[in-house]
């Protein structure tokens, strides 16, 4: 069973999320959902903080359906959520894949991330996000600041971990996946994908197939 965690401004009905789900169905059952504040889901996005509760609920539901083995596959924001979920919820998942995730919070080193921070932190940005991207963002800052992805990674072992990142990612350069891989040491794998951009939009069917095979091979 795969539980797919989409990126920021994604939703279960977005074409790129549906494509990911279709690709993974060749390897097992798939659960998709929209994080809080995204698409038709209620509430407001906390941009990766309380979203860990949403993923936990989806994984729990997958278990209740009778699936003994569950792997999470997260993209960008969803990738950071998958890392934190695996660190905080012991034995909740049997394999974790994080695609295009940041290593640390508050990164503004690229133009796309500076635009994203404008969407999140400015009132006018949140209006654009609501009506332009169907994503409703909570106005409050994080308090406390959640465990960062790079801090979460060492807590995931012995659960199998795969970190996937494109070397042409315009949001988070390759120092992010390398930091995550260093934190995982010999407990994780790193795939640096030549020419790949960011998150679901950039994940080819061939890559999704390899991810599906990896999860099946590790989670059983």
Task: Identify the role of each PLM range.
Residues 46-65:
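Alpha/beta-hydrolase active-site loop
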Residues 170-176:
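Conserved alpha/beta-hydrolase "acid-adjacent" motif
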Residues 196-206:
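Catalytic histidine-centered segment of alpha/beta-hydrolase-like enzymes
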Residues 74-78, 82:
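Gly/Ala-rich beta-loop-alpha elbow adjacent to hydrolase catalytic centers
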Residues 8-21:
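The serine-hydrolase catalytic nucleophile loop
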Residues 21-42:
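Conserved alpha/beta-hydrolase
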Residues 90-141:
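Hydrolase active-site cap/lid region
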Residues 156-157, 163-165:
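Short beta-strand/loop motif that positions the catalytic acidic residue
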């Amino acid at each position: 069973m795969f539980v797919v965690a989409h990126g920021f401004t994604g939703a279960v009905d977005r074409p790129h999320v549906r494509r990911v789900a279709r690709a993974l169905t060749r390897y097992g059952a798939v659960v998709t959902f929209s994080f809080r504040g995204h698409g038709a889901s209620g509430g407001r996005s906390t941009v990766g903080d309380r979203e860990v509760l949403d993923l936990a609920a989806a994984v729990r539901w997958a278990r209740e359906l009778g699936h003994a083995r569950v792997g999470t596959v997260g993209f960008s924001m969803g990738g950071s959520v998958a890392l934190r979920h695996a660190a905080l919820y012991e034995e909740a998942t049997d394999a974790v894949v994080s695609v295009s995730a940041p290593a640390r919070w508050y990164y503004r080193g690229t133009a796309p991330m500076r635009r994203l921070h404008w969407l999140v932190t400015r009132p006018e940005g949140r209006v654009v996000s609501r009506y332009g991207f169907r994503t409703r963002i909570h106005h409050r800052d994080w308090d406390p600041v959640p465990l960062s992805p790079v801090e979460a990674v060492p807590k995931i072992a012995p659960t199998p971990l795969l970190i996937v990142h494109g070397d042409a990612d315009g949001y988070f350069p390759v120092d992010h996946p390398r930091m995550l891989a260093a934190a995982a040491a010999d407990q994780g794998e790193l795939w640096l994908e030549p020419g790949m951009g960011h998150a679901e939009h950039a994940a080819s069917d061939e890559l999704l197939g390899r991810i599906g095979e990896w999860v099946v091979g590790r989670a059983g």
